[in-house]
């Protein structure tokens, strides 16, 4: 069955019953096929086919018809924290709160456990150009897996929990508890070397929740629980500079940070900071999307240090918990639902989790100077 539902004029609701918060969204990594995978705290992996058609113009903007078709659902034994497509094969990897790492092919009804972390498996990344699976867990272990033997080929043990990982080209960045950051040069794997180029403390004072790497692999962004994003540039061939409190850190004249996902509480005349729950980089245009606890998503032009667009999900300010952009750079998926940042006692104030598709108009994909 196909569905076509609009929300806030431009956002399209996928009418599927989701029992608990959506933790992760990933589009299929092909411009020709717009499959969307979701995973979350109801322990279900869901697949949707997303289609769009430009049917006209209104005030110089595209009028778009979007349809969403549920494809498959795969029940897991534990909530899903992360997922990744295995390139364009159609199969996926999932990481769960029980530490399990799983291989899933919904079309062939194949579900195989690949391995295990001693804590929750917070991140799974399939690195296409190296054909490897990377996983990071709350046990502090960063592992590369042999998909045939079900054993890690190599691993690196941190002293801190892994909260987020991101990569592009040869750059892998890891965000850990206590604001510890690390980055790796994946080209070193050809020399059987799997050691971080640098381990250091983030300049952001609050906990880093999400990290994403720029498309060109020349830098990355950190998103924190108190509504702040830091943009960091690096070069593998530049010697790190000693900065702040005796910690080795990367420092570039182009680095900057900014506040976001904050709301003014008029009665108290105070500023309420909300967590940045997820970020993604537009694979075509390089703009960055952040979603947060204030129920808004923002689109950022990092090069021009400016905001391209912002949008609120709904009137009750239900937090946004996950996001991704399709390979063509024009469809934005995001999930709304309680992010539990205020505790269980406030869960009843928010609506049931939902997944939306937003068509990015041309002026919202990139800066005016692109």
Spans of model-derived segments:
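WD40-repeat beta-propeller superdomains and closely related acidic/aromatic-rich repeat-like regions
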Residues: 1-370
């Amino acid at each position: 069955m196909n569905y076509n539902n609009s929300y806030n004029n431009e956002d399209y609701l996928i009418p599927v019953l989701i029992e608990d918060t959506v933790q992760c969204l990933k589009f299929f990594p092909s411009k020709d096929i717009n499959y969307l995978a979701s995973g979350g705290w109801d322990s279900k992996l869901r697949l949707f086919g997303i289609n769009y058609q430009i049917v006209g113009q209104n005030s110089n903007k595209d009028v778009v018809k979007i349809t969403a078709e549920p494809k498959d659902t795969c029940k897991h034994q534990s909530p899903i924290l992360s997922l990744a497509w295995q390139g364009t094969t159609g199969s996926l990897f999932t990481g769960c709160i029980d530490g399990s790492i799983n291989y899933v092919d919904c079309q062939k009804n194949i579900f195989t456990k690949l391995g295990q972390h001693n804590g929750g498996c917070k991140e799974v990344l399939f690195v296409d150009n190296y054909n490897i699976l990377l996983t990071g867990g709350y046990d502090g272990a960063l592992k590369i897996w042999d998909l045939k033997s079900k054993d890690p080929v190599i691993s690196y043990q941190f002293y801190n929990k892994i909260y987020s990982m991101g990569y592009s080209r040869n750059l892998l960045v890891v965000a850990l508890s206590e604001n510890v950051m690390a980055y790796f040069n994946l080209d070193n794997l050809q020399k059987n070397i799997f050691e971080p180029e640098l381990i250091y403390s983030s300049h952001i004072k609050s906990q880093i929740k999400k990290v994403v790497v720029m498309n060109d692999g020349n830098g990355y962004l950190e998103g924190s629980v108190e509504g702040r994003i830091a943009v960091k540039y690096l070069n593998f061939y530049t010697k790190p500079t000693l900065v702040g409190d005796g910690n080795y850190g990367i420092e570039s004249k182009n680095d900057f940070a900014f506040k976001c996902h904050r709301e003014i509480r008029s009665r108290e005349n105070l500023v309420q900071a909300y967590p940045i729950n997820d970020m993604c980089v537009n694979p075509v245009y390089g703009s960055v999307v952040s979603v947060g606890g204030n129920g808004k998503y923002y689109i950022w032009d990092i090069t021009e240090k400016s905001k391209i667009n912002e949008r609120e999900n709904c009137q009750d300010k239900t937090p946004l918990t996950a996001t991704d952009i399709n390979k063509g750079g024009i469809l934005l998926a995001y999930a709304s639902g309680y992010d539990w940042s205020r505790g269980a006692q406030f869960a009843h104030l928010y609506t049931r989790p939902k997944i939306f598709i937003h068509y990015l108009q041309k002026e919202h994909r990139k800066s005016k100077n692109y």
